[in-house]
Amino acid sequence: MEREISALYEPKRNNEIRIFESSDEMSTDLAEYISQVSEISVKERGYFAIALSGGPLVSFLGKLCEAPYNKTLDWSKWYIFWSDERAVAKNHAESNYRITKEGFLSKVPILNGHVYSINDNATVEDAATDYEFVIRQLVKVRTIGVSESNDCPKFDLILLSMGSDGHVASLFPNHPSLELKDDWITYITDSPQPPPERITFTLPVINSASNIAIVTTGDDKSEAVHLAISDNADGPEAPSSLPARMVQPTDGKLVWFLDKSAASSLDAENDDAFEQHREY
Protein backbone atom coordinates (compact mmCIF):
# COMPACT_ATOMS: atom_id res chain seq x y z
CA MET A 1 0.00 0.00 0.00
CA GLU A 2 1.25 3.45 -0.90
CA ARG A 3 0.06 6.57 0.84
CA GLU A 4 0.35 10.20 -0.08
CA ILE A 5 0.85 12.62 2.76
CA SER A 6 -0.92 15.93 3.29
CA ALA A 7 -1.92 18.48 5.96
CA LEU A 8 1.13 19.44 8.08
CA TYR A 9 3.31 17.92 5.40
CA GLU A 10 1.59 19.33 2.35
CA PRO A 11 4.18 18.84 -0.39
CA LYS A 12 5.78 21.96 -1.77
CA ARG A 13 5.23 22.84 -5.40
CA ASN A 14 6.31 19.96 -7.64
CA ASN A 15 7.10 17.79 -4.61
CA GLU A 16 5.44 14.47 -3.85
CA ILE A 17 5.69 12.08 -0.91
CA ARG A 18 4.99 8.35 -1.15
CA ILE A 19 4.94 6.01 1.83
CA PHE A 20 5.03 2.21 1.57
CA GLU A 21 4.17 -0.69 3.83
CA SER A 22 7.05 -2.87 2.62
CA SER A 23 10.33 -2.78 0.73
CA ASP A 24 8.81 -4.91 -2.02
CA GLU A 25 6.03 -2.39 -2.59
CA MET A 26 8.54 0.43 -2.65
CA SER A 27 10.72 -1.40 -5.19
CA THR A 28 7.70 -2.09 -7.39
CA ASP A 29 6.58 1.53 -7.42
CA LEU A 30 10.12 2.83 -7.85
CA ALA A 31 10.61 0.60 -10.90
CA GLU A 32 7.42 1.90 -12.48
CA TYR A 33 8.41 5.47 -11.69
CA ILE A 34 11.86 5.08 -13.25
CA SER A 35 10.34 3.31 -16.25
CA GLN A 36 7.95 6.19 -16.87
CA VAL A 37 10.66 8.84 -16.54
CA SER A 38 12.89 6.83 -18.87
CA GLU A 39 10.20 6.45 -21.53
CA ILE A 40 9.33 10.15 -21.44
CA SER A 41 13.00 11.19 -21.65
CA VAL A 42 13.74 8.88 -24.58
CA LYS A 43 10.64 10.08 -26.41
CA GLU A 44 11.41 13.76 -25.84
CA ARG A 45 15.23 13.80 -26.07
CA GLY A 46 16.36 10.46 -27.46
CA TYR A 47 18.39 9.79 -24.30
CA PHE A 48 17.88 8.93 -20.64
CA ALA A 49 20.63 10.35 -18.40
CA ILE A 50 20.32 9.00 -14.85
CA ALA A 51 22.61 9.60 -11.88
CA LEU A 52 22.70 7.02 -9.09
CA SER A 53 23.97 6.85 -5.55
CA GLY A 54 25.36 3.71 -3.97
CA GLY A 55 24.64 1.88 -0.77
CA PRO A 56 21.14 0.64 0.01
CA LEU A 57 19.57 2.49 -2.92
CA VAL A 58 20.82 -0.09 -5.41
CA SER A 59 18.90 -2.87 -3.67
CA PHE A 60 15.65 -1.14 -4.61
CA LEU A 61 16.44 -1.29 -8.34
CA GLY A 62 15.98 -5.05 -8.52
CA LYS A 63 12.52 -4.91 -10.10
CA LEU A 64 14.02 -3.18 -13.15
CA CYS A 65 16.07 -6.32 -13.75
CA GLU A 66 12.91 -8.42 -14.01
CA ALA A 67 9.99 -8.69 -16.41
CA PRO A 68 8.53 -6.64 -17.89
CA TYR A 69 11.15 -3.90 -17.57
CA ASN A 70 14.19 -5.95 -18.57
CA LYS A 71 12.52 -6.52 -21.94
CA THR A 72 10.46 -3.38 -22.53
CA LEU A 73 12.80 -0.55 -21.55
CA ASP A 74 15.02 0.89 -24.27
CA TRP A 75 18.25 0.21 -22.42
CA SER A 76 20.33 1.35 -25.40
CA LYS A 77 19.30 4.93 -24.61
CA TRP A 78 20.30 4.80 -20.94
CA TYR A 79 23.38 6.75 -19.78
CA ILE A 80 24.58 6.05 -16.24
CA PHE A 81 26.33 8.49 -13.91
CA TRP A 82 26.99 8.71 -10.18
CA SER A 83 25.94 11.61 -7.98
CA ASP A 84 28.78 10.74 -5.64
CA GLU A 85 31.59 8.27 -5.22
CA ARG A 86 34.04 7.27 -2.53
CA ALA A 87 37.70 7.77 -3.43
CA VAL A 88 38.47 4.06 -3.47
CA ALA A 89 39.32 1.54 -6.17
CA LYS A 90 36.43 0.33 -8.31
CA ASN A 91 36.78 -3.18 -6.87
CA HIS A 92 36.70 -1.90 -3.28
CA ALA A 93 33.75 -3.02 -1.15
CA GLU A 94 32.77 0.62 -0.51
CA SER A 95 32.87 1.68 -4.16
CA ASN A 96 29.49 2.93 -5.35
CA TYR A 97 30.46 1.74 -8.82
CA ARG A 98 31.07 -1.79 -7.59
CA ILE A 99 27.84 -1.85 -5.57
CA THR A 100 25.87 -0.67 -8.60
CA LYS A 101 27.68 -2.99 -10.99
CA GLU A 102 27.00 -6.08 -8.89
CA GLY A 103 23.46 -5.19 -7.89
CA PHE A 104 22.12 -3.64 -11.09
CA LEU A 105 24.33 -2.98 -14.11
CA SER A 106 25.44 -6.60 -14.51
CA LYS A 107 21.78 -7.65 -14.76
CA VAL A 108 20.53 -5.27 -17.48
CA PRO A 109 21.72 -4.68 -21.07
CA ILE A 110 23.07 -1.14 -20.68
CA LEU A 111 25.92 -0.46 -23.10
CA ASN A 112 29.33 -0.34 -21.43
CA GLY A 113 30.13 2.87 -23.29
CA HIS A 114 27.14 4.53 -21.68
CA VAL A 115 28.38 3.96 -18.13
CA TYR A 116 30.38 6.95 -16.86
CA SER A 117 32.15 6.01 -13.67
CA ILE A 118 34.47 8.28 -11.72
CA ASN A 119 38.22 7.89 -12.28
CA ASP A 120 39.69 5.80 -9.47
CA ASN A 121 43.29 6.22 -10.67
CA ALA A 122 43.49 9.95 -9.94
CA THR A 123 43.63 12.07 -6.82
CA VAL A 124 40.24 13.02 -5.47
CA GLU A 125 40.70 16.58 -6.74
CA ASP A 126 41.69 15.45 -10.23
CA ALA A 127 38.88 12.90 -10.30
CA ALA A 128 36.33 15.63 -9.59
CA THR A 129 37.81 17.86 -12.29
CA ASP A 130 37.84 14.99 -14.76
CA TYR A 131 34.23 14.03 -14.06
CA GLU A 132 33.04 17.60 -14.51
CA PHE A 133 34.90 17.77 -17.84
CA VAL A 134 33.23 14.56 -19.04
CA ILE A 135 29.80 15.84 -18.08
CA ARG A 136 30.44 19.20 -19.76
CA GLN A 137 31.30 17.42 -23.02
CA LEU A 138 28.08 15.41 -22.85
CA VAL A 139 26.08 18.56 -22.15
CA LYS A 140 27.56 20.15 -25.28
CA VAL A 141 26.18 17.35 -27.45
CA ARG A 142 22.95 17.22 -25.39
CA THR A 143 23.34 13.63 -24.25
CA ILE A 144 22.69 15.36 -20.94
CA GLY A 145 20.23 18.22 -21.10
CA VAL A 146 20.99 21.74 -19.96
CA SER A 147 19.05 23.91 -17.54
CA GLU A 148 17.69 27.07 -19.11
CA SER A 149 17.89 28.91 -15.80
CA ASN A 150 21.52 28.35 -14.83
CA ASP A 151 23.26 26.37 -17.61
CA CYS A 152 23.83 23.44 -15.25
CA PRO A 153 23.48 19.89 -16.56
CA LYS A 154 19.86 18.82 -16.48
CA PHE A 155 19.85 15.11 -15.71
CA ASP A 156 16.62 13.35 -16.54
CA LEU A 157 16.66 11.67 -13.14
CA ILE A 158 18.88 11.81 -10.07
CA LEU A 159 18.28 9.01 -7.58
CA LEU A 160 19.43 9.75 -4.04
CA SER A 161 19.31 8.12 -0.65
CA MET A 162 19.50 10.03 2.62
CA GLY A 163 21.60 9.35 5.70
CA SER A 164 20.39 9.61 9.27
CA ASP A 165 22.19 12.97 9.48
CA GLY A 166 20.24 14.25 6.47
CA HIS A 167 23.10 14.04 3.99
CA VAL A 168 22.47 13.32 0.32
CA ALA A 169 25.08 12.29 -2.25
CA SER A 170 28.26 13.25 -0.35
CA LEU A 171 26.90 16.60 0.81
CA PHE A 172 26.96 16.67 4.60
CA PRO A 173 25.36 19.07 7.11
CA ASN A 174 27.23 22.33 7.73
CA HIS A 175 29.88 21.49 5.13
CA PRO A 176 31.32 24.29 2.95
CA SER A 177 30.47 22.27 -0.17
CA LEU A 178 26.81 23.19 0.40
CA GLU A 179 27.65 26.79 -0.49
CA LEU A 180 29.16 26.10 -3.92
CA LYS A 181 27.30 27.85 -6.72
CA ASP A 182 29.43 27.54 -9.86
CA ASP A 183 31.05 24.10 -9.57
CA TRP A 184 29.19 21.10 -10.97
CA ILE A 185 31.34 18.50 -9.26
CA THR A 186 33.36 18.93 -6.10
CA TYR A 187 35.42 16.82 -3.74
CA ILE A 188 35.75 16.56 0.01
CA THR A 189 38.57 15.17 2.14
CA ASP A 190 36.85 15.36 5.52
CA SER A 191 33.70 13.28 5.24
CA PRO A 192 32.26 12.64 8.72
CA GLN A 193 31.65 9.08 7.55
CA PRO A 194 34.42 6.86 6.18
CA PRO A 195 36.04 6.95 3.76
CA PRO A 196 36.93 10.64 4.18
CA GLU A 197 37.68 11.41 0.51
CA ARG A 198 34.70 11.62 -1.85
CA ILE A 199 33.52 13.16 -5.10
CA THR A 200 30.01 14.59 -5.29
CA PHE A 201 27.52 16.53 -7.38
CA THR A 202 26.89 20.01 -6.00
CA LEU A 203 23.44 21.27 -5.01
CA PRO A 204 23.00 23.38 -8.17
CA VAL A 205 23.44 20.26 -10.30
CA ILE A 206 21.09 18.17 -8.16
CA ASN A 207 18.44 20.88 -8.13
CA SER A 208 18.67 21.36 -11.90
CA ALA A 209 17.52 17.81 -12.65
CA SER A 210 14.20 17.21 -14.37
CA ASN A 211 13.35 14.61 -11.75
CA ILE A 212 14.82 13.83 -8.32
CA ALA A 213 13.87 10.87 -6.15
CA ILE A 214 15.03 10.46 -2.56
CA VAL A 215 14.65 6.85 -1.40
CA THR A 216 14.82 6.47 2.37
CA THR A 217 14.12 3.60 4.75
CA GLY A 218 14.54 2.87 8.46
CA ASP A 219 13.47 4.49 11.71
CA ASP A 220 16.97 5.89 12.19
CA LYS A 221 16.13 8.28 9.32
CA SER A 222 12.74 9.37 10.66
CA GLU A 223 13.90 12.53 12.42
CA ALA A 224 15.92 13.63 9.39
CA VAL A 225 12.88 12.98 7.18
CA HIS A 226 10.80 15.19 9.48
CA LEU A 227 13.41 17.97 9.40
CA ALA A 228 13.77 17.73 5.63
CA ILE A 229 10.08 17.75 4.77
CA SER A 230 8.05 19.54 7.41
CA ASP A 231 7.40 23.25 7.15
CA ASN A 232 6.95 23.13 10.93
CA ALA A 233 10.32 21.53 11.64
CA ASP A 234 12.44 23.50 14.05
CA GLY A 235 15.91 23.23 15.45
CA PRO A 236 19.29 24.42 14.19
CA GLU A 237 19.56 21.91 11.36
CA ALA A 238 16.16 22.37 9.80
CA PRO A 239 16.28 25.77 8.10
CA SER A 240 19.55 25.95 6.25
CA SER A 241 22.14 23.26 6.85
CA LEU A 242 20.31 19.97 6.29
CA PRO A 243 21.28 18.88 2.77
CA ALA A 244 18.11 16.87 2.15
CA ARG A 245 16.01 19.93 2.97
CA MET A 246 18.06 21.92 0.46
CA VAL A 247 17.07 19.60 -2.37
CA GLN A 248 14.45 21.71 -4.13
CA PRO A 249 14.26 21.36 -7.91
CA THR A 250 14.62 24.59 -9.86
CA ASP A 251 12.07 23.57 -12.47
CA GLY A 252 11.78 19.81 -12.00
CA LYS A 253 9.96 17.48 -9.62
CA LEU A 254 11.03 15.84 -6.36
CA VAL A 255 9.50 12.57 -5.15
CA TRP A 256 10.20 11.09 -1.72
CA PHE A 257 9.97 7.29 -1.45
CA LEU A 258 9.65 6.39 2.24
CA ASP A 259 8.92 3.22 4.15
CA LYS A 260 6.73 3.39 7.24
CA SER A 261 9.71 3.48 9.58
CA ALA A 262 11.35 6.42 7.83
CA ALA A 263 8.00 8.24 7.86
CA SER A 264 7.26 7.42 11.50
CA SER A 265 7.95 10.94 12.79
CA LEU A 266 5.52 12.28 10.22
CA ASP A 267 2.94 9.74 11.37
CA ALA A 268 3.43 10.62 15.01
CA GLU A 269 2.66 14.28 14.43
CA ASN A 270 -0.17 13.82 11.99
CA ASP A 271 -1.90 10.45 12.26
CA ASP A 272 -4.95 11.67 10.37
CA ALA A 273 -3.03 13.30 7.55
CA PHE A 274 -2.65 10.21 5.37
CA GLU A 275 -4.76 9.22 2.44
CA GLN A 276 -4.61 5.73 0.98
CA HIS A 277 -3.34 6.15 -2.54
CA ARG A 278 -2.83 2.72 -4.06
CA GLU A 279 -3.02 -0.92 -3.13
CA TYR A 280 -0.86 -3.66 -4.60
From Swiss-Prot:
It catalyses: 6-phospho-D-glucono-1,5-lactone + H2O = 6-phospho-D-gluconate + H(+). One of its GO terms (molecular function) is 6-phosphogluconolactonase activity. It comes from the Eukaryota. Pathway: Carbohydrate degradation; pentose phosphate pathway; D-ribulose 5-phosphate from D-glucose 6-phosphate (oxidative stage): step 2/3. Hydrolysis of 6-phosphogluconolactone to 6-phosphogluconate. Belongs to the glucosamine/galactosamine-6-phosphate isomerase family. 6-phosphogluconolactonase subfamily. This is Probable 6-phosphogluconolactonase 2.
